[in-house]
């Protein structure tokens, strides 16, 4: 594999990661499919995917840095719901949402890693698509939590339970959490924001664990390739998040569900 070829693969996968990480279409599923298509599926490929996820995480930090600092009591500018002891997004909301997936993820880590194949992704794309449709069809007519600061601890925990579905490669963490939030009475926009903020500790924890298990696959010769993938994922994810938060004010998740079904069909024709 030539250096130029490696950089091209890094760029392509960086675009795929950044574009799909926070959309309800499954970045992992797309990375597995595109990785197999490019023939980049060895242990280094798995480590590379972990590294470029950090670029996507950084994009969320840049977008929501005020909120993230606010969770630990550091506020810049006006404090949401100032003077109230309730009605404000707190660190406890995030911790409650993390617990279910963290527990199951640690218990079934090795089993989950064994599911990283296109065939498994195909099934999860379809089931995740139906969950998006269910969220649109069965959500309350009037959301009980319109904004991010209206989300209750119970809703946060239930969103965390839905997040467990994303342990199945190809399901989509954002798709599971946003759909779960909507079914629990959270507005589409607030559920999306909560999903993005929740992604920071969840993805960071998973990334650190994966890096710990695969650090011996890293070498200085891979730094340029990893750097290209990281930067590309960061830039594309930043654009994708901003665009996504704009369009969900005007459209439902039905187009994303249809897209998932189409991708599942392509996977069936190519890999089955």
Curated annotation (Swiss-Prot):
Single GO MF annotation: undecaprenyl-diphosphatase activity
Cited InterPro entries: UppP
GO biological process, one term: cell wall organization
Membrane topology: Multi-pass membrane protein
Protein function: Catalyzes the dephosphorylation of undecaprenyl diphosphate (UPP). Confers resistance to bacitracin.
Family: Belongs to the UppP family.
Protein name: Undecaprenyl-diphosphatase
Species of the source: Pectobacterium atrosepticum (strain SCRI 1043 / ATCC BAA-672)
């Amino acid at each position: 594999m030539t250096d130029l070829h490696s950089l091209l693969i890094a760029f392509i996968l960086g675009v795929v990661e950044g574009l799909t990480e926070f959309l309800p279409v499954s970045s992992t599923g797309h990375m597995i499919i595109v990785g197999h298509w490019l023939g980049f599926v060895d242990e280094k490929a798995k480590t590379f995917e972990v590294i470029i996820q950090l670029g996507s995480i950084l994009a969320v930090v840049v977008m929501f840095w005020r909120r993230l600092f606010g969770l630990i009591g550091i506020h810049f500018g006006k404090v949401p719901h100032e003077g109230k002891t309730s009605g404000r997004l707190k660190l406890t909301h995030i911790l409650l949402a993390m617990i279910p997936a963290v527990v199951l993820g640690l218990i079934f880590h090795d089993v989950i890693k064994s599911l990283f194949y296109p065939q498994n992704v195909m099934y999860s794309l379809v089931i995740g698509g139906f969950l998006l449709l269910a969220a649109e069809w069965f959500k309350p007519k009037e959301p009980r939590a319109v904004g991010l600061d209206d989300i209750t601890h119970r809703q946060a925990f239930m969103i965390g339970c839905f997040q467990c579905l994303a342990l199945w490669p190809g399901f989509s963490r954002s798709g599971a959490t946003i759909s779960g939030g909507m079914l629990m009475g959270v507005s589409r926009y607030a559920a999306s924001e909560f999903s993005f903020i929740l992604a920071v500790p969840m993805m960071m924890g998973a990334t650190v664990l994966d890096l710990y298990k695969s650090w011996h696959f890293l070498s200085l010769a891979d730094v340029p390739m990893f750097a290209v993938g990281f930067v590309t994922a960061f830039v594309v994810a930043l654009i994708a998040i901003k665009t996504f938060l704009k369009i969900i004010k005007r459209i439902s998740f039905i187009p994303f569900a249809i897209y998932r079904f189409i991708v599942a069909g392509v996977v069936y024709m190519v890999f089955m």
